[in-house]
Amino acid sequence: YEIAQCLVGSEMCIRDRDTNTGNIIVGTIGQSKLIEQAGIDISALKNKKQAFMLAVSEDGKLVVAGSDSHGTAYGILEISRLLGVSPWEWWADVTPEKKETFRLSGKFRELQSPSVEYRGIFINDEDWGLMPWSNKTYEPSDVKGEIGPRTNERIFELLLRLRANTYWPAMHECTLPFFLTKGNREAAKKYGIFMGASHCEPMACNAAGEWKIRGKGAYDYVNNSPAVYQFWENRVKEVAGQEILYTLGMRGVHDGKMQGAKTVEEQKAVLNRVFVDQRGLLEKYVNKDVTQVPQVFIPYKEVLDIYHAGLQVPEDVTLMWCDDNYGYIRHFPTAEERARKGGNGVYYHVSYWGRPHDHLWLSTMSPSLIYQQMKQAYDQGIQKMWILNVGDIKPAEYQIELFMDMAWNLDKVSFEGVTAHLKHWLERELGTSCAKTILPVMQEHYRLAHIRKPEFMGNTREEEKNPVYRVVKDLPWSEREINERLNAYSELSETVEKAASKVPADRQSAYFELVKYPVQAATQMNRKLLYAQLARHDKEDWEKSDAAYDSIAALTQHYNSLENGKWNRMMDFKPRKLPVFNRVERNAATAPMTADRKAACQWNGAEAKKGNAIVCEGLGYEGKAAEIRKGDALTFSFGNLKTDSVEVDIRLLPNHPVHGDKLRFSVSLDGAEPEVIAYETKGRSEEWKENVLRNQAIRKIVLPVTGKKSHQLVIKALDEGVILDQVMLYEVN
C-alpha cells in the first residue's frame, strides 16, 4: 500500500487476497461513502484537524476514518504501529517481525488527534552527514550538493510514521536549495508535507544557497530592497498551490544579523516595512485574505532583542520562540502573546553548530531535559508549532521520536513518564530481553553526557577571537572525578558489548546504530580526552588516549559499512574538523590538576527533607533535580560542624526565566534573614557559555554557623522556573 495514496485519495478498501472481500475500510469523512456506510459513530472526528479513528464495525471490518487526509494517513500508519512496526523500520534498520495473524476485539475503538498543530523537523548542518550520504550514496547525483526527491520521500515517509507534518529542508551553502532541485516540490505535495523554513529563510527562500544564484547585489533591504523584493516575489509565484508555512522577517544571508541597519531601532523599522511588503506578496499570490495564510515569525538570537524593543508582529502570525541552542528555551509567551490569533511555536535544538561549542556528532541531549522544557512550553501556551533541529536525523532517532510523541499526544507521554517512554521504545526496537538490560545503560549514557557532552570534553570553545580557546586542555576535575567517570563509561561499554547477544540477528544493525555506536563512541571520546589529561600529569600512558582515538575511527568505519554500505558517508566523527576530534597532542601540564574537595554535606534537589519538590524525572547531574514553584521552599538538614561558617554551593539547571526577565531564589540558614540570589544570564555572556558547557548555573555563598546540633538550610524560589540540581556544603577553615 502506497502511504502517500491516503493523502491524495478519498477512500479505499483493502481486500483479502483469497476471498476478495474487504476487511479494512479506509476513508476521509465527508469524502467517503464507505465510511458513511460502515455503521460506526464518527461524530467525534468532526471539527478536528489531522484526527483519526480506528474501530471494528459490527460486521467485523476494521474501519480507518480520518477527519482529513492527514488524519487518514496517520490512521493507516497506526495499524502499522499496532503490528509492532517501528517508524524507524528503514531509517534505523529495525526489521519488522513477521506475524501470521493479528486480532482486535470487536469493541476496539481508538480516537487520536494532535496536541500541536504543526510538528516537524529541520535538517541542518548537513555538510558531513545527510548531504554527502544522499548525494554520493543513496541518490548519487552529478549535481554538487543535490538532495533529491528520492531522499526527501524517505524523510517524508518517516515524518508521517512519526505523525509529523512539517519540514524545514537543509539549507547550508553546500546543499543545492530544496526548491531548485527537480522533483522535491512534487514529493512534498505527494506526502502532504507542509514546507517551512528557518529564521534566516523568509518567504520560502533559502537565502544562503539561492541569493548567489538568483539575487542581484547585496541582500540588504535598506539599500537594495527592489532586488530583495523581486527575489521573494519570484519564489511566492513559483510555489503557488504548495502547502507552505511562510517565515516572515529578515536576517542576514545565513545565520547573521540584518544588513544595512545598525541599531536595534533601525532594524525594527526595517522589519516593520518587511512585514508589510511580505504580506502584500502573500495577498497578491496566495490568498487575498492574508490572515488565512499560515505565517511564522522567529525571534532567534539578535532578533529577540528587536522584538523586546517593541516590534509589532501582525496578530495572525505565529510567534516561534527558540531555545538557546543547548536545550533551554529563552522566552515563554506572556498572557498577551498567548492570546494572539496566530498562536505560539517553538524551535528547539538537539544538534547545533556555534558558540560556545558545536554538538553535531552524537546527539546526547537529555530526554529528561527535552521533556521538562517542552512540557513547560506547552503549559505556557506554545501549542501551534513545534520544530526540532535534528542535524542529519541520525543518530538523533530517540530524541526525535520523543519530541514528536509529545507533540502528538502530550498527555500520554506525561502520564507514562520519560523512563517508561524510553523503555517502550527500546522494547519495540530491540526486543524485551535486550531492552531490560539496555534501559539503565541509555539512562546513564544520557546522564553522563548531560554533565558534559562528548563534544565538550576537550575544554575547548569555538568562534572566539582568542585562538587559545581552541587548544585542548584540562577540565577542572580532580583525579578522583576523572577516574569515576572513566569507570562509569567502561561499565556502559562492557554491558553494551555483552547485550548484543540478546539482539535478534535481523536487528543487529539497529542495535549498532541506536545503542552501540552512540554509547561506545561517547565512551572512547571520554577515554581519549581524560586519559590525555591524566597523561599530561604523568598519571597515565598516552597510548590509552591514542587507542581510544583509533577505536572511534573503527566504530565510525563500521557504522558506514552497515547493511552493505547503506549508510556510507552518513557518520563522520569529525564534523567541522574541530580540534577536540583529533588525536590529542602530547604535551606536559603547566599547572597542577584540580585538587579534590570533599563536601561536608551534599544533596540532590529531590532529597530535601521538607518542601514541595517537583522531581524532574532523570534530570540533573545525578538524575534527581527538582523544580521549586514560585513561593515554595525546600529545606535541607545537617548536623553540627566544627566550623563557624560554611560555603554553600547551589547548583541549578542553567535555564532561562519563565515570566519576565528574572530568575531568583533566596537562601537562609537557621532562620536568618534570607539572602536573595539572581542567576539569569544575558545573551551569549561569558557566564552563559560556562553554564552551557557544564550544564549547571552555580551560585556560592558563605553563611555563619551557630553551635546548634542541627541546622536547617532553606532555599526558596522567588520566580517561576527555579530547578535545583545539587547543593554542596563545605566547611570554611
Predicted regions and their residues:
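Short, small-residue-biased leader/transition segments that mark boundaries at the very start
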Residues: E2, C6-I14, A547-T594
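Hydrophobic or amphipathic alpha-helical targeting/insertion segments
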Residues: G60-V94, L180-A204, K216-N234
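The substrate-binding groove and active-site-proximal loops of carbohydrate-active enzymes
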Residues: V63-G66, D127-P149, N165-T175, E210-A227, ...
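An acidic-aromatic substrate-binding cleft motif
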Residues: W88-K144, R150-A170, G342-G345
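Gly/Pro-rich turn-and-neighbor structural signature
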Residues: K99-L104, H172, F179, A187-K190, ...
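Structured mid-domain segments that build the active-site/substrate or prosthetic-cofactor binding neighborhood
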Residues: N165-W168, T175-F178, G183, W321-G327, ...
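Extracytoplasmic
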Residues: D572-N733
